[in-house]
């Protein structure tokens, strides 16, 4: 089970998330209590092991800005978390190593996720980072075989049920492992990662365990 910890704002939290077993960390560049400057995100990312997927999160930003920011900060992925068109998403996907395209639960666009050129497809609630849980059956609209990353109100207490209901490729958490917005709780992170891995210890069989070889990308 692929685990992403989003909303990292400090080097300490980034290093700790990875030490506890996170496969990916997210840096929010969109307006948010967890917003971080791209330069600072890049500094933190450079302290992390090369196998970690470092993700810049954007919401309805200009596509040129997305590509330039991700590459300047030397991040490994862009996450588009707004109402980006398939054409804009495709454009970004051709200019960054990995693209994550997020859809709100119930969004009819989820059925056409493949048109966005995304390596990973996320399903979240309509208010990212709010901690609100949505009806997990709404994730069933994702195309078969995509790497589905489930988000939206997950925490150590409900992630096992979410995995059992949706069978995602990975899970994403932010507020569910915090003491306050942007400040991660070590115990909550440990508990969340342990619960997710216990619920689905084996890789998702519908695709590769990870979307590409992080090590090769750095050569």
Where would I find each of the regions flagged by the language model?
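Conserved N-terminal beta1-alpha1 strand-loop-helix module at the mouth
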Residues: 1-219
